[in-house]
Amino acid sequence: MAEVITEYRNENTKDIDLLSTIDMVRKMNEEDQIVAKVVGEEAPNIAAAIDVIAKAFLKGGRLFYFGAGTSGRLGILDASECPPTFSVDSTMVQGIIAGGEKAIRNAAEGAEDNFGAGREDASILTEKDVCVVISASGNPKYLLGVLEKADEVGAATIAVTCNSKGHIAEDAGLVICAEVGPEVIAGSSRLKAGTAQKMILNMLSTGAMIKIGKTYENFMIDLKAVNEKLKDRAIRIVSQIAGVTNSEALAALL
């Protein structure tokens, strides 16, 4: 197996089990400060990925996130927020997790080792689509199967990882590698690695939607007003852009 940085022991937290609760929290927060800086260093690669995704959207393509465990759940989370935020069809951005729907709530640890399942799940891809594989370690065989199938159909491939020595970093067309270092608890990649992945996915989907015109300035002008909070937001957006009262904005929206 390739070297896995996320499995290393963090020298800064060796005594975490002996700390007071407040010192434990401060130690975790200290480690979290690393994440934003490391993600920022990947800005050029993130920007390149956004341009690839936006170009695919404009040509009728879709964005697929593939991952196992925490990484898969983060992909599903990001995908699920796109329809209400940007008023896009639920098929435009999709998250797929190793092990299927049941793995969203319950750990399916062995699923990440299934190369064939990755190929099968990736059979949904076409040459118009973008395939983003997400993994802290960069080594799940499931994702290697996804990448192999994606290459066969001609889909663009992007790896989001925290390990430059992982296999997906070798196989993907574009790599975003946020090496956040060893976790507070050795191997618990839901922590710093998961935070880094969430930040990156936020930028990928939001950036691509901005590029295809889903915002005006920094307003989400294509939102679906499906609840009271979003209806109120729609009124405020129209009011601020048009320079009218909330009542006038509401009347225009009805």
Predicted feature locations:
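Cofactor-/ligand-binding subdomain signature composed of acidic, glycine-rich
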Residues: 1-38
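Gly-rich Lys/Arg/Thr-decorated short loops/hinges at beta-loop-alpha junctions or inter-strand turns
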Residues: 29-35, 95-105, 216, 234, ...
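Short, glycine-rich nucleotide/cofactor-binding loops
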Residues: 35-44, 133-140
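A short, well-structured juxtamembrane/interface segment
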Residues: 41-56
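Glycine-rich phosphate-binding loops that contact phosphosugars or nucleotide phosphates
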Residues: 64-199, 208-212
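Internal, active-site/partner-interface "lid" segment
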Residues: 206-241, 246
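Small-residue helix-packing motif on alpha-helices
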Residues: 249-250
